[in-house]
Amino acid sequence: MMNHKFVLLILLIFYCFFLSGCNNSKKTPCSRKHSHKELSKDDPHNLVYKGYYKVGSQYKIKGKTYKPNAPKSFTETGYASWYGGGGDKFHGKKTANGDMFNKNLLTAAHKTLPLPCLVKVTNKTNNKSVILMVNDRGPFKPNRIIDVSAKAAEVLAFKKQGLAKVKIEYLHAETEKFLKNIKVNKSSNKTLAKSSKKPSSTKVANNKCSINCHIKLVNLKYKLAVN
């Protein structure tokens, strides 16, 4: 009887230790159900980042001037729209920094933030949040601060409505780590952006994890659902 209680006590201590390890992890959550294969299901062959790092020069659209920059901190509140519906003309086309737009990935377009970068977008109506990779410019319609992919609109639960009031938070530290993980060199690509040469492609740090997989891993780190 005593031996049985002792075994149960040891098992209980081990279980508590395991839970503590999961909660204190600074990496991704300990859940083993999220394999790299599963997280890469939307872009399994997207192991090479097709774009390059770009801040860009001042530009004008519809009479309004925009000044791209690379801030350390940035927040913005306003309305989000989404693009990438059925027959959408943007799906499969190049973005402002040479990447390829895919409506099924966790991406977004912003007028001034560096490309690519990570932002946390929160739907102010339902408090749903998701971390997205900004890889394009826009939106240029009045009263809209960000365009998100069709998939991101689903996660934020405003796809049917078309618009949602959101808060954007630029994640500077996470962006720096993300750029290293997908092998994007900021210093070398600044010059490439000004030239006619196409930047050379290099595989991501983990060749079992696609670009979208790396975005999802950051979401899981912040305990945000992405499926």
Swiss-Prot record:
Any single GO BP term: cell wall organization
Domain of life: Bacteria
Pfam families membership: DPBB_1
Main location: membrane
Keyword Cell cycle (UniProt): no
Enzyme class: lyase
EC number: 4.2.2.-
Positions of N-palmitoyl cysteine lipidation: C22
Gene3D superfamilies (UniProt xref): RlpA-like domain
Residues making up the signal peptide according to the UniProt record: 1-21
Family per similarity comment: Belongs to the RlpA family.
Function according to Swiss-Prot or TrEMBL: Lytic transglycosylase with a strong preference for naked glycan strands that lack stem peptides.
The protein's name in its UniProt record: Endolytic peptidoglycan transglycosylase RlpA
Gene (UniProt): rlpA
